Amino acid sequence: AAGDMVLAMIRNKGGIGFVTDSPMRDLVGIQDVGLPAWCNGLNPNSPYANGPGRVGFDASVGGQIVSSGDIIVADIDGVVVVPHARIDSVIAKLDAVRAAETAMEAKVKSGFSEQSRILQMLNDGRAVMDD
């Protein structure tokens, strides 16, 4: 499990964040390092000092394949991988997505309580409401 020393070394080399599909250790120390980190839990065990490990290869993290050149976007809610080949198309859609989310937020604040898509899923049996 990576911990505060590993994150400090990553920060010292210019890293701006750390994402792992494994647990991490030394939570208080990690917070003190100040490098944002995402993991799947906490564990007091030390990392392997002699491997296994590979650098520069595709990796599966959280069920997603991550390749060199991919963009990683992360916040408090989680981590998203944007494949390098799709970066331009994703960027092209950002304004439309922001506008749709802003419009939906305004509708919900005004009292909106259901979406037709959800009702359609309930009506055609693709979703079930549990009272």
Where are these regions (language model features)?
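Feature captures the catalytic cores and cofactor-binding loops of soluble hydro-lyases/lyases
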Residues: A1-S68, V82-D131
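Channel- or pocket-lining gating/hinge segments that regulate access to a cavity or pore
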Residues: G78-V80
